[in-house]
């Protein structure tokens, strides 16, 4: 506080109980007097309502790292790339930004508390470059609060921010289930046994208008055996107990079934071409690569051949490689040149394998199907607050 003498006095009317409460609060915060506390409150309030001068960004050049017939890998900051990009010139932004993990990793995670503030400049850029009928797809993993078996809400706060502040529409939330994911977090899953394993990422499919161009006919899954039998033997139209009317059209062969928004895609590329390429050259392996089938799904469903796909957090350039294989123009921007050096493996030798060339299905068993005697397995009464004794 200022050491200058205070020549002006003022009266503040409050009850005895209110005065006592305020004085107690001021004392607990270390203020020597009630006056000092009230002046500090006023200064804080004035600072909160004062406009903050936002310094304009100085656009820096991004360097062209590698170019193909259809796309380019860029080394630099994607904010700079978007600053110089023509407005409404991108059909799909497909990306997996650094997750706001509580335990920061080597690839540049922001503290989850500040994640939305960190993301805002990117949201501005996305809104600028995306076409009105385009899509923004964000694969984003969850985070655990440090020291507790409870979840951060940062990825939901990000979704709300993009919709409420920037006017994006949630076309449909998707959930990427990785059947090969290890039981994590180990402390709560394997040690204290108070949570099931976290094996799903949220994937937000957003758009500038409620009606982005799309077709689910582009991403059909094979029919199940029961549906194949129904198509072969016919189906009698009827009303189900739920009240839904199943018409004769239900028995029409449409070439495949419409997939759900639960995407079962194993991420099992631990010993693939990309890793071998990086290991032989002593390069950093990007720690958060999504499988090629994930961008393939959205690229097929929301873009046409010749459209433009952009990944602002390019990493090992999976999005670019899939876009190239599907005949889309593309750009991937990555700040770490070592990751781009490893990404070269995706454009040398054999092209990336698409989903149609490696069809697969996964079985997930019904929870509670394994026989367990409840009397022999007591609940963890303290909710996992203490580690079990060995």
Which residues are covered by each model-predicted region?
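Short, flexible loop/turn segments with low-complexity composition
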Residues: 53-57, 217-222, 353-364
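A generic structural micro-feature
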Residues: 4-6, 38, 194-198
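C-terminal helical cap(s) of enzyme catalytic domains, especially alpha/beta-barrels
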Residues: 340, 344-354
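Conserved SAM/SAH-binding loop
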Residues: 75-80, 360-369
């Amino acid at each position: 506080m200022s050491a200058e003498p205070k020549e002006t006095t003022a009266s503040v009317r409050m009850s005895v109980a209110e005065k006592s409460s305020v004085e107690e609060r001021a004392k607990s915060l270390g203020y020597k007097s009630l006056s000092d506390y009230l002046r500090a409150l006023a200064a804080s309030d004035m600072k909160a309502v004062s406009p903050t001068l936002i310094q304009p960004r100085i656009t820096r050049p991004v360097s062209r790292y590698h170019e193909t017939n259809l796309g380019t890998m860029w080394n630099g900051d994607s904010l700079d790339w978007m600053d110089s990009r023509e407005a409404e010139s991108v059909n799909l932004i497909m990306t997996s930004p650094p997750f706001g993990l509580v335990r920061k990793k080597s690839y540049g995670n922001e503290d989850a508390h500040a994640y939305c503030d960190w993301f805002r400049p990117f949201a501005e850029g996305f809104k600028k470059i995306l076409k009105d009928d385009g899509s923004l797809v964000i694969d984003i993993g969850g985070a655990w609060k440090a020291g507790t078996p409870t979840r951060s809400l940062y990825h939901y706060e990000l979704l709300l921010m993009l919709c409420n502040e920037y006017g994006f529409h949630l076309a449909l939330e998707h959930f990427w289930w990785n059947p090969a994911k290890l039981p994590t977090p180990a402390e709560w899953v394997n040690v204290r046994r108070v949570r099931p394993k976290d094996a799903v990422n949220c994937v937000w499919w957003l758009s500038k208008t409620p009606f982005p161009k799309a077709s689910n006919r582009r991403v059909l899954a094979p029919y199940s055996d029961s549906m194949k039998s129904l198509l072969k033997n016919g189906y009698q139209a009827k009303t189900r107990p739920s009240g839904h009317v199943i018409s004769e059209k239900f028995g029409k062969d449409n070439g495949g079934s419409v997939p759900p928004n639960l995407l079962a895609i194993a991420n099992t590329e631990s010993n693939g071409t990309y890793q071998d390429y990086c290991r032989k050259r002593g390069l950093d392996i990007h720690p958060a690569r999504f499988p090629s089938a994930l961008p393939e799904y959205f690229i097929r469903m929301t873009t046409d051949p010749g459209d433009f796909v952009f990944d602002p957090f390019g990493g090992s350039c999976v999005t670019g490689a899939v876009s190239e294989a599907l005949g889309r123009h593309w750009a991937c921007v990555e700040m770490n040149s070592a990751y781009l050096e490893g990404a070269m493996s995706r454009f040398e030798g054999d092209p990336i394998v698409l989903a149609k060339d490696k069809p697969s299905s996964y079985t997930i068993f019904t929870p509670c199907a394994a026989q367990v005697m409840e009397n022999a397995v007591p609940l963890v009464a303290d909710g996992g607050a203490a580690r079990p004794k060995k």
